[in-house]
Amino acid sequence: MNILYTNFHPGNGGGHTTYLTYLFNGVLSQSINAFIAAPEVSKLNKDLKKNNPTRVFDIDFPGKPKEVVNIIKNIRKLKKIIIKEQINIVHVNGTPDHKVVMLCKWFYKLNFRIIRTKHDSFKIKQNWFADKLYGKYTDQMIVVSNFQYDQVITNDLQKKTTVIHNGIDLEYFHPREKSEAMMRQFNIQDTDIVFVSVAGTALHKGWQFLVEAASNLDDELRSRIKIVLVGNSPTNKVVEQYINQIDMQDNVIFTGFMDDVREAVSIADIGFVLSIGVETISFACREMMAMGRPVLVSDYAGLSENIDNNQDGWIVEQKSASQIQKFLQKIKRLDLIEFSNSANKKSKQEFGLGCFINNTIKVYL
């Protein structure tokens, strides 16, 4: 079996990068011949080339009509790889790379199977192009949450769709003592209640609703709430609108992008992922739980599938600052040590890489 993974993201890639890194290394460890094609400038390409330079190919996946020349160029590059490496399966991870792979298969009449993982929560459009893409040019589809599976409209596509929840590296993400250095760096006190998110800083991640909720607390509790956000810092306009205008600049900390998020997670009392769009299941949520941090999540898409409510975390209505505020007001009565132990226990039972890798390989067979 020769598998080619594809990914269109030219930058950091977020969850796509995590997913494909785990999967690529996982199938190689089981003696399956695997390759990956991704933009040369992408984090995924650079990371995987360090240990597997001959298995990583520089390919872009343009998708706009005005990019037709570049599309043709990359289709030709893709065809050469597929023929040379005798690829049986191309595992695509987004619509741009799926389109290019489809055109390559159609134009050159190549014989390989296409597996698609759907990483977002958007409904599949119903038009002639989507019918082709997800019909003839999708042999099997993987979704990472039950929510996505329920969103699949057609019976034909649902029959060839498998739910495989994301796995994480439990040897890498495990409980550790709070980082005193990071506490000092961000001037966080032992009496503070620290919320951390490593899910990113885009507004669709919903962090602004936690900030709003905290701003409405009484002065004593409000002063103790610290909200730490790991990821690229937002624009000054976003900071002004969602933080400064409600006088929360002393409560919110942007760390900037971190390759290793464990130090940041270590200082958390509670993790949070309050997404209002795009999200499916969230690697970040599972990573924080594996490190023994209970997580506050919104009920958007598949986020709630990570949590047993009021046992290893909490579920609130998406976009509801008022529900979050009610949660914050009862936080001093919670036994966070018990919640932390439950979160870590859940991760050991359900979030490991073994099932994730093995269940994906079953789709290939």
Which sequence ranges carry the predicted segments?
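N-terminal strand-loop element at the rim of the active site
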Residues: 5-13, 17-19, 23-70, 161, ...
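Short hydrophobic beta-strand element within catalytic cores of glycosyltransferases
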Residues: 37, 294-297, 307
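Short His-centered aromatic/hydrophobic patch
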Residues: 92-98, 118
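A conserved, positively charged/aromatic
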Residues: 112-142, 155
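Carbohydrate-associated surface elements
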Residues: 147, 167
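Active-site donor-binding acidic/aromatic loop of nucleotide-activated sugar
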Residues: 235-238, 249-258, 264, 314-315
